[in-house]
């Protein structure tokens, strides 16, 4: 069966997940923050056969069984439309957990994870699943809380997974390792922070600080070293399929990520952003991420997202949405344009800057660029 887990994060969630696996079933975590109509749409789309809530365990009519070996169905973050159900097997979950633990030199007798990200999304759920697979202790919090995150480190927790906004709100220096996913990482990160790259289809982060984990292969477009193109990933931690039965992988098992990037001469991956988010201005392609990274170095800027608006002359123009630091005044547009022009390219400099209170984000911390307008 596919069992929807409509429970808050915490020990009861972990107990229920373990019981589902022990019964040979697969779990579909439901985000408890969703309004009820959104939950019902999610259930109608992904069609679990049973649902577990605080009130009990119920059959759900019209559900579709899983394939043998399936472990999870996880909704994508939905930055580009209605979330899909990504099917992961016990083999792919194990491969991801083992590769992560090896890459971080995790010792179950020494280390302890803290799970504080939403468990309905792969970044939070993978902390719990790798704990179950490897036997590493894990403290599961119902939600991110600054005081609790800091106090858990003082109590001996050594590993935590955060998104950029959460990292900026707490002191995580007490952890041996902080995995950072979601939105673009700050240019200057603490020494215990590892910047991760991955997605629901890859079973969470599969590239750490630009280097693929064991068992992960990377390719760019046609394979030309140093060229900019779509990032392709291959490895045993990839999804089996989507819930509707479609398989996004190409011939040879390569998964097209939809992200643009390149592989440096030293083998490390640089990701520039979603292929669909490239701004084409005056015939030149502008990737948002490099522009955001440069603007983030300005003292006045707390957060920034770069995208586009239609332009009658240039086709599209580069626009920066900026969240200011408390008490800061907005930098002059001319200053921003000069900085970006000198660090990235003159044509990449924003034509417009919009000051906002906050950036729209997915539960996983990624900016929803389509909601910037």
Where are these regions (language model features)?
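Conserved AMP-binding/adenylation subdomain of ANL enzymes
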Residues: 95-112, 120-159, 213
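Conserved ATP/PPi-binding loop(s) of AMP-dependent carboxylate-activating enzymes
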Residues: 212, 223-252, 274, 284-286
């Amino acid at each position: 069966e596919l069992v929807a887990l409509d429970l808050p994060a915490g020990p009861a969630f972990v107990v229920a997940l373990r019981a589902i696996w022990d019964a040979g079933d697969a779990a579909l975590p439901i985000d408890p923050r969703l309004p009820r109509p959104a939950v019902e749409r999610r259930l109608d789309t992904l069609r679990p056969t049973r649902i577990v809530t605080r009130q009990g365990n119920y059959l759900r009519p019209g559900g579709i069984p899983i394939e043998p070996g399936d472990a999870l169905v996880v909704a994508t973050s939905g930055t580009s439309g209605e979330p899909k159900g990504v099917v992961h097997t016990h083999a792919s979950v194990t491969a991801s957990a083992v590769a992560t633990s090896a890459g971080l030199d995790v010792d179950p007798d020494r280390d302890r994870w803290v799970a504080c990200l939403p468990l309905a999304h792969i970044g939070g759920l993978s902390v719990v699943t790798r704990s179950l697979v490897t036997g590493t202790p894990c403290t599961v919090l119902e939600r991110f809380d600054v005081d609790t995150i800091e106090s858990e480190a003082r109590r001996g927790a050594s590993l935590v997974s955060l998104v950029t906004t959460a990292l900026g709100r707490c002191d995580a220096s007490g952890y041996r390792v902080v995995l950072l996913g979601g939105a673009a990482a700050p240019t200057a990160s603490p020494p215990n922070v590892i910047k991760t790259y991955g997605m629901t289809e890859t079973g969470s982060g599969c590239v750490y600080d630009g280097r693929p984990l064991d068992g992960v292969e990377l390719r760019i477009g046609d394979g030309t070293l140093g060229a900019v193109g779509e990032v392709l990933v291959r490895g045993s931690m990839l999804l089996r399929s989507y819930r509707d039965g479609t398989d996004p992988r190409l011939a040879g098992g390569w998964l097209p990520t939809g992200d643009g990037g390149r592989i440096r001469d030293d083998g490390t991956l640089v990701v520039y952003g979603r292929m669909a988010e490239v701004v084409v201005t005056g015939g030149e392609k502008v990737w948002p991420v490099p522009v955001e990274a440069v603007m983030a170095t300005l003292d006045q800027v707390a957060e920034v997202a770069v995208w586009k608006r239609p332009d009658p002359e240039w086709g599209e123009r580069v626009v920066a949405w900026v969240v200011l630091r408390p008490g800061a005044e907005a930098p002059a547009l001319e200053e921003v344009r000069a900085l970006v022009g000198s660090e990235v390219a003159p044509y990449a400099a924003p034509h417009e800057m919009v000051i906002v209170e906050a950036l729209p984000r997915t539960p996983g911390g990624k900016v929803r660029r389509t909601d910037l307008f």
